[in-house]
Amino acid sequence: MQGIFITFEGPDGAGKTSVLKEVSERLAKESKRKIVTTREPGGIPIAEKIRTVILDPRNDRMDERTEALLYAAARRQHLVEKILPALEAGHLVLCDRFVDSSLAYQGAGRRIGIAPIASINAFATEGVSPDFTIYLDVDSDTGLRRIQENRTQQIDRLDSEGLEFHQRVRHEYLKLAEENPQRIKKIDARMSLELVVEATYQAIIERYPENF
């Protein structure tokens, strides 16, 4: 039985990581499949080390293409070491970010362009794509305000980018959602955490009713 690969996407401040945690705990109680949660960049030791390099605010001289290639390298190792084995075992994989993030952040945010980022990641993933994507949408002003108010850890390199950068990121996410309606479910993340969690959970069980 092949597994199910679900990704969680959204601009900074959408509450994506918190929603994934709540939803995964609920799914673990009700799903017929084992739930595997992971994140990008990260999820395995090699990729977590790359994550530290990418997000360290002291690395302010990092070239945007270097950044894009580091994300793709972390993604490749994460995919072959954790995601694909879990899918082959029939598990339900919930991943905090995947290729859509690179398209939005490096392709649009960094203005590298969508085509080269898509090409880099096609090589890294060998065409592996999520079965379903939850996109948590929030306007850039609200997202940045939430980051400033709620982040307990250090603000990272991407969080510290200006409003226009985050607006470009969100615009690309909205474009991706419009172009991929069968894969991407857009959810209004301006709602309370409880309502967003419920909407996300319902979207998953409606998509995969046989899993419950």
Curated annotation (Swiss-Prot):
Enzyme class: transferase
Xref: Pfam families: Thymidylate_kin (PF02223)
Entry's Gene Ontology molecular function annotations: ATP binding; dTMP kinase activity
Annotated GO biological process: dTDP biosynthetic process; dTTP biosynthetic process; dUDP biosynthetic process
Catalytic activity: dTMP + ATP = dTDP + ADP
HAMAP family: Thymidylate_kinase (MF_00165)
Function: Phosphorylation of dTMP to form dTDP in both de novo and salvage pathways of dTTP synthesis.
Family assignment from sequence similarity: Belongs to the thymidylate kinase family.
Protein name: Thymidylate kinase
